[in-house]
């Protein structure tokens, strides 16, 4: 049996074209139909009695799958051709059919790239811009942070400058530079108070003074500027000194309150070319002028003497206080001078009462002079009436100053005849006794005088006898008593019953 391959190929081509025309659906449906037709034709191929040809190449296999699919679809329409298909052996399609199939397959993936390209564009658009801004922000973040802190401490430095000397403080502990004096001053705190240790020309010297004071005040554990071993000699010397004494030693070692071109305390160069000595801040005054001197040392010594007189041996001086032992008065002499000074301005014994009481006691003051008052007080303290009795010249001094009112006669020294008669009567009991001038006293019943103001017992019980009262009434004391009664003061004058001698009475009347 002979088979014409050409006829079979033509019939297959015609069937394929017919199937392509009938299948106007999508590519997916044709593929499914091809799978179904392939599955249906597989048993027919296995049952064929013809000798199978050698295996076709890979492109022939693909083409064979298409041919079988088309032949299966065409078999339903033409049953007469079934025998021919079973007997026919599949063969590779002709060359022009292979090209037609390749062209057909190239049309399927042509629509796929468009969505892929669109998806890629959507994926690439949002991603690139995101990382770039983040990188830029991180790069610029660190630089702006450092600039703000530096300007803050600058205003604090400006505040310190207002404090004046504190703006140029030293690097050493307890040392400060003062522009007003141009020196380095050292201070230390003790019991809540700042103790001045002195002014120095260099900060190093001021720091040394502070270290010595700190060791003295706080012990070897104190915070100091230099090593503790540098002050071993000073520690041995300061054991026998108190804090105050040691501070005075440090101040003497300093340059003191130097002004101008002088290195001594309290000395300055005057515009006239001489050296002026003055002591400041004493008794609330700005300074005390001590004079001009030809040499700087003389002015410094004048300052030292004035400081010792005002502040004692503990005064801060330019030189050792022992150098002025022969030039300064001793303590006893200084005390004596103070006593004389106080007595010269003290009130007399008769006026030691209160001002109110003196104003209502008829103004009877015996002692008016400061000199007489001081002599009287000294004699009263010594309790030596005989010494006063031997001084007749004191009597006229007591009557130098008349009373305040001249219209009324002086009650102590009456100048009328009645007073002379009373004195003659009182003189008869004892004519040889002379009564000193201080025998007359003023006594107030409301305010009796203290006992120590009466050096001699002038008063007795007989002073209130009728004879004494009548004598007082007949004398000039009657007017004083009347005035005292009007003033509601019962002040009387008592005297010794022994009347004064004729010499004293005559001397008394002669004076008036």
From Swiss-Prot:
Keyword annotations: DNA-binding, Nucleus, Repeat, Transcription, Transcription regulation
Listed GO CC annotations: nucleus
Extent of motif Nuclear localization signal: 159-168
Organismal lineage: Eukaryota, Viridiplantae, Streptophyta, Embryophyta, Tracheophyta
Matches recorded under Gene3D superfamilies: AP2/ERF domain
GO molecular function terms listed in the Swiss-Prot or TrEMBL record: DNA binding; DNA-binding transcription factor activity
Subunit relationships: May form homodimer. Interacts with TPR2/ASP1.
DNA-binding region extent: 171-227, 263-320
Name this polypeptide is given: APETALA2-like protein 1
Ranges of compositional bias, category Low complexity: 39-50, 460-492
SMART domains: AP2
Ranges of Polar residues composition bias in the record: 21-32
UniProt region (Disordered), positions on chain: 1-100, 119-174, 347-367, 401-433, 460-512
Gene name of the encoded protein: AP2-1
Biased composition regions of type Pro residues, renumbered to the chain: 51-60, 141-154
Biased composition (Acidic residues): 78-88
Compartment(s): Nucleus
The species this protein was found in: Oryza sativa subsp. indica (Rice)
First-listed, main subcellular location of the protein, grouped into a coarse class: nucleus
Motif (EAR): 341-345
Family listed: Belongs to the AP2/ERF transcription factor family. AP2 subfamily.
Known role: Probable transcription factor. Involved in spikelet transition. Regulator of starch biosynthesis especially during seed development (e.g. endosperm starch granules); represses the expression of type I starch synthesis genes. Prevents lemma and palea elongation as well as grain growth.
PANTHER family per record: AP2-LIKE ETHYLENE-RESPONSIVE TRANSCRIPTION FACTOR, ETHYLENE-RESPONSIVE TRANSCRIPTION FACTOR RAP2-7
Biased composition (Basic and acidic residues): 127-137, 418-430
